[in-house]
């Protein structure tokens, strides 16, 4: 029986604040040794979003290095942010979105929380793999709003889930 050929991965990563904000709360992890590529976006407007996104990836990578599965590693990141926000006044409410892909040969696992997205880019098309945990996406899902309306809606940046949010 022949073994599947290893998948060659070529990647590049860049994170910019954009044209609206002057401060970037993103963190990136590109770890081919773990088969992991991840982005965490600290909660803009919340206390210490850059701390939350960095902590999310630190915990995610650490858990995977210890042999945890991706889902368990994401949960560890969530708990770490929730715990870090508790003892320090002014940090309550800090949180982060997360999108992570883990490759194993020619298969992959995908995890996400919030509205950071994962796409599969092929030679013929681009396919969104994740599904936003956002207020506007929930409205689209139940037919109360079109995707076009969601792109312009004043609540388009309201997310329903994030790492560090108590009660998830």
Model region roles, listed by residue range:
Residues 1-168:
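PP2C/PPM-type serine/threonine phosphatase catalytic domain
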